[in-house]
Amino acid sequence: MEISALLERHRHSRQQIGKRLLEFREFSSKQVMWTYEQDEIKLVPSSCKHDERLFEELAFCILAANTSAEMGMKTVDRLRKMLHHASPKQMTTAIKGVYRFINLRPQYIVHSRTYLQQLDVPFHELLRSFEDKQELRDFLANNAGIKGIGYKEASHFLRNVGIGGFAILDKHIVKSMHEFGITPTSKPPSSRRQYLELEQRYVEWAESLGISPEELDLLLWSRKTGKILK
């Protein structure tokens, strides 16, 4: 696909992309949650506490890694009633036939849940305590208490709770960068240094197109799936 065709796709999908980005910001300010309904990921009203909704989103990012946003969302829906108290074994039983990594990811979720529950500060206050969002991402990606979250997943989580400006450098995005001649290789980054270097190229590419990093991510994914995901 030529750059001109990519920009034309953006022109046609700009309204949908803008709506999804607004929903990411609304997630932190309104009583809402994500769900998979009628073959679509939707934002719907929720009675859950703020920290419960934030942890749901963290679990989603753990589950979506190396699978898909839709599989991750369907699995969160299956786990929602037990996410805050169930054992890994109970979660594994619940997601058989729905999810791919039925043993390891529940362990990551429970490990992270236990760590966050033992902190002296609520999850939402912990996130707000970082004045520098780069330091916040470093904390999430490098913290042994939070399993299944690296730089890609931390960037995904922060974007989805309204903290933008990062690149979510999964294999599809990196492959797209290579296809458009932005990088010499389609190999995903394997260290913090590589991630930051590739992220800088991504951000500069978005700026050259006249769109935000968040818009470009959703645009590239819509090119692959035909949908505006999360």
Residue ranges and their predicted role:
Residues L63-M71, L83-H84, Q117, G165, ...:
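Short alpha-helix boundary/capping elements
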Residues M1-I41, P106, V121-D138, G145-K230:
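C-terminal accessory module of base-excision DNA glycosylases/AP lyases that mediates lesion recognition
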Residues E57-N66, V110-T114, R159, D217-T225:
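Short, hydrophobic/amphipathic alpha-helical patches that form generic packing surfaces
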Residues I62, I95, Y99, V161, ...:
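Short amphipathic alpha-helical interaction patches enriched in hydrophobic/aromatic residues
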